Amino acid sequence: MTDLTALTLADAKEGLAAKSFTALELTDAHLAAMESARVLNAYVLETPDKARAMAKEADTRIAKGERSNLLGIPLGIKDLFATRDVRLTACSKILDDFKPPYESTITSQLWRDGAVLLGKLNNDEFAMGSSNETSAFGNVINPWRREGSDTALVPGGSSGGSAAAVAAGLCLGATGTDTGGSIRQPAAFTGIVGIKPTYGRCSRWGVVAFASSLDQAGPFARTVRDSAILLRSMAGHDPKDTTSVDRDVPDYEAAIGKSVKGMRIGIPREYRIGGMSSEIEKLWAQGAEWLKAAGAEIVEISLPHTKYALPAYYVVAPAEASSNLARYDGVRYGARVNGKTIAEMYENTRAAGFGPEVRRRIMIGTYVLSAGYYDAYYLRAQKVRTLIKRDFEEVFAKGIDAILTPATPSAAFGIGEKGKADPVEMYLNDIFTVTVNMAGLPGIAVPAGKDAQGLPLALQLIGRPFDEETLFSLGETIEQAAGRFEPKRWW
């Protein structure tokens, strides 16, 4: 039998429908792969008993002739999604051994469509990070290595466990969240596909909040088609989430293979930043050539407020985080460190429970929201955000169908290489991705090449609001031209 963990999600769906193998066999193959890849530290919790029970239920449904979008498909879930009676920590000590009594809307939709839960995936603490080095459960190791080197590399963040697990064949797909690039950047670093849908496309109910006006959940998968299949189950209106948009969910998979002839693709001149590697520049030009060869028109565009996006993001996101994280006080759930007074108990609990990066962002957020600085920082950042959104609206109003940019300024870097002395160095990883969150747009990262050391590099496509289908069509065009990328197994 073929190695079941090497299948794409679409192939696995076909195999299950044809009864070439069972959902239990597919699940067991992934559980075995997870066991042999623990050195990657992708999972913070494995749920083999639950997975096998769900797989058996899927086999029963398949035997009855039932068809469903994800029936029998084993998935990993980022440890930011509430999963009923299954531990949720946000990879922070402050949530300790918390088991939510409810299910997030997105995971309940995945289980409705027949998916199987393999376990919870590692991420940066409270999704704050670009390298998965802030998790209370330790670093995730990227399954990719530089040629001729055994240096451990970061998988990107915050959804590093999700990206590493999909790239290493430890699940057929995974959930992630993206606040400033936390799906697209890890996907780029691990040679897989990651899409951040339009803000409001997927429910945020039951997902631990970082920055509520920026957070959006989305899928990780090995191919563009697999991403489209997963997004169909994840998307949809949810009355429990006031930011969820009531729009029909299209059949995203139908966009795969559609012609891109006549589409107008924008190349923003402001994304040509100083210090960009020649490899990224060449890849960007190559991506434009591939789309041109497929019949698309390449147009140079301007997004003049791009240079303000990163500083504005690092005012807005910490401000919202400081408000959202005020609820973690050790009173009703999670870890508690006692004190002589209730105020001291709050202080002790939060000091011991939050890691240094989370504490840093809470302090920045509290500072920019304080009476003396609210207008100077937070209000000004929100005005900049409006200008960034307007830049995109004006470009799309001129008939641009999508925008092509690099996904990251570099390939994956070594653990401990960045941000130790200066956190801003780490924040610069989000330079190509934050604008998409600030404007609430959809963005997809698609692997498109390798650097001189054999590490994957990706391109990003940015679309009009709720036009993920165009991104899937264009993304698949790049995927067909570039081919697929898989790490050599060393673990």
Curated annotation (Swiss-Prot):
Q: What is its EC number?
A: 6.3.5.7
Subunit structure as annotated in this protein's UniProt entry: Heterotrimer of A, B and C subunits.
GO MF assignments? ATP binding; glutaminyl-tRNA synthase (glutamine-hydrolyzing) activity
- List the taxonomic lineage: Bacteria, Pseudomonadati, Pseudomonadota, Alphaproteobacteria, Hyphomicrobiales
A Pfam family it matches: Amidase
Disulfide bridge positions per record: none
Which reaction is catalysed here?
L-glutamyl-tRNA(Gln) + L-glutamine + ATP + H2O = L-glutaminyl-tRNA(Gln) + L-glutamate + ADP + phosphate + H(+)
Q: Does the keyword Secreted apply?
A: no
- Stored InterPro entries: Amidase (IPR000120), Amidase_CS (IPR020556), Amidase_dom (IPR023631), AS_sf (IPR036928), GatA (IPR004412)
Q: What class of enzyme is it?
A: ligase
What protein does this entry describe? Glutamyl-tRNA(Gln) amidotransferase subunit A
Which family is annotated?
A: Belongs to the amidase family. GatA subfamily.
User: Which GO terms are recorded in the biological process aspect for this UniProt protein?
Assistant: translation
Catalytic residues (UniProt): 78, 158, 182
